């Protein structure tokens, strides 16, 4: 049994793993876990990942969850070019620092924009209160500024002159609001960094990985599993 990656490219962490594997020529079987149909709650998937999250990796009998752990595993097993996860102590620590920070500072608020502006209204027919969206946008703007000042500074990439895992993870997370046509790349510094990362990845691969996200507004939500719709309606309650 070869390497299997369980993913849905609506998920930013899945896109990071997918792009990294494709960019580095790592052979894998794509096991599609449709989040919109609740496949991550299926008995079969829970046996692979009891946390019911994506992505997951299965390499023979070895199973791994969490995108950052998966990216580091792939780096080591397949001897990826060193710029992805630099061997230099300080540069690698900088990547680790960003990875630890981004979970709550970037991933969570970026996903909230997608949920609040698109997914919840689309599925439930109910709008999330405007003040909730405004609060999330304020958080995003604050954290984007911190990203620019703390991590990017005046460098081409987070660790210097070359793309790293930190840049890849940062960009796919910041793309999440694009599912609602919300652009967070307002400043010239951030927009220029975004384009450098896209070009380093390859524009074809980059947009292939984001195709499912940008097409989300045209998704027919009548195909949604009723049990999943119920879970989302329950999820909405905390935004009221």
Swiss-Prot record:
Keywords in alphabetical order, please.
Cytoplasm, Transferase
Where is the secretion signal located?
A: none
- UniProt binding sites for glutathione: 40, 53-54, 66-67
InterPro entries recorded = Glutathione-S-Trfase_C-like, Glutathione-S-Trfase_C_sf, Glutathione_S-Trfase, Glutathione_S-Trfase_N, GST_C, GST_C_Theta, GST_N_Theta, GST_Theta
Matching entries from Pfam families are given as: GST_C, GST_N_3
What GO cellular component entries does it have? cytoplasm
A GO term, aspect molecular function: glutathione transferase activity
Tell me its EC number(s), please. 2.5.1.18
What's its top-level EC category? transferase
Source species, domain of life: Eukaryota
The UniProt entry lists the main location of this chain as cytoplasm
The subcellular location is: Cytoplasm
Which ranges carry the GST C-terminal domain?
A: 88-218
Every GST N-terminal domain range: 1-82
Q: What does this protein do?
A: Conjugation of reduced glutathione to a wide number of exogenous and endogenous hydrophobic electrophiles.
Query: What is its quaternary makeup?
Result: Homodimer.
Family designation: Belongs to the GST superfamily. Theta family.
State the name under which the record lists this protein.
Answer: Glutathione S-transferase theta-4
Q: Which gene encodes it?
A: Gstt4
């Amino acid at each position: 049994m070869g390497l299997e990656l369980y993913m849905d490219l609506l998920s930013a962490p899945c896109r990071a793993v997918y792009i990294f594997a494709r960019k580095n020529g790592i052979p894998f079987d794509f096991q599609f876990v449709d989040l919109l149909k609740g496949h991550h709650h299926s008995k079969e998937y829970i046996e692979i990942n009891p946390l019911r999250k994506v992505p997951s990796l299965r390499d023979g009998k070895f199973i791994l969850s969490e995108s950052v752990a998966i990216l580091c595993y792939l780096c080591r097993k397949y001897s990826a070019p060193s710029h992805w996860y630099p061997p230099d102590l300080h540069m690698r620590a900088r990547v680790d620092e960003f990875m630890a920070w981004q979970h709550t500072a970037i991933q969570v608020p970026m996903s909230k924009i997608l949920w609040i502006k698109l997914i919840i209204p689309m599925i439930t027919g109910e709008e999330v209160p405007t003040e909730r969206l405004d609060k999330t946008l304020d958080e995003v703007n604050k954290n984007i500024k911190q990203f620019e000042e703390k991590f990017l500074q005046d460098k081409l990439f987070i660790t210097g002159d070359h793309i790293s895992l930190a840049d890849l993870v940062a960009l796919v997370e910041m793309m999440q609001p694009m599912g609602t046509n919300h652009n967070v790349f307002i400043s010239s510094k951030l927009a220029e960094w975004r384009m450098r990362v896209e070009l380093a990845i390859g524009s074809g691969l980059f947009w292939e990985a984001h195709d499912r996200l940008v097409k989300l507004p045209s998704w027919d939500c009548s195909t949604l599993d009723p049990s999943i719709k119920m879970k989302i309606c329950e999820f909405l309650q905390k935004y009221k």
